[in-house]
Amino acid sequence: DGIFLLATFGFIKEYEFEYFNPYITKKQKGGIQFNFNLKDQNHLEYNTINHIPVFYKSKKSLDKTLSTHIEYSHRESFYNYHYFKLKYQNTKINDSTKILNENYINTKKNLNQFLTISYEFDRDFRDIKNYPLKGFRLNASIEKTGLGIFGDVNKLKARIYYSQYFKLKKKFYYSFNLYSYVSSNNQPYYLFEDENNVRGYQTYLIQGHSNAIYRNTFKKELFNRIWNLEKY
């Protein structure tokens, strides 16, 4: 079992609680995760101009979002995992946010809420997950936001990620990864994707409902030494 607690203060106040149990079945192949998150912002990115994010600061709350989800994970084998998630999210903004960007939540009222259901598959054959040098990983997911209960959002997203790692001669290593997603167009501003960082463009925000990113990496091992810390 594991419990995670978070509390941050400042322009963005955030409180989070998470409980995770990877083995809830007798065969130890099923796990459960529960998450609760509350975020309150009075310094808000509300739009972009020439692909540069624009912010607004206020003494009042501009965006208050409550989200909670439950996720079931199934370990098919040592390398294959399946994840099933159900999420609820509720976002409330004030009048200033709506004046700054009418499409921020894309509803006539100052409240937007929805349910999300998703499935994710992960196949991981990497030698070391934190710093892989050999092997490959395949991750794919499909997500439906808005199940027709509240009627505020209707979005479908599919995503795929693949990476492979090679050991070359003379202690050189090469790897590549491909990431791509496609999602529904004409969505509220705050639901645009924000999970892709392209080297050299970290200060820019290019909005879109689909993309593909391909990366290459070369590495050279300069030295390799193991220290025995037990004697200390």
Located regions from the model:
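Gram-negative/organellar outer-membrane beta-barrel architecture
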Residues: 1-118, 123-126, 192-196, 204-209
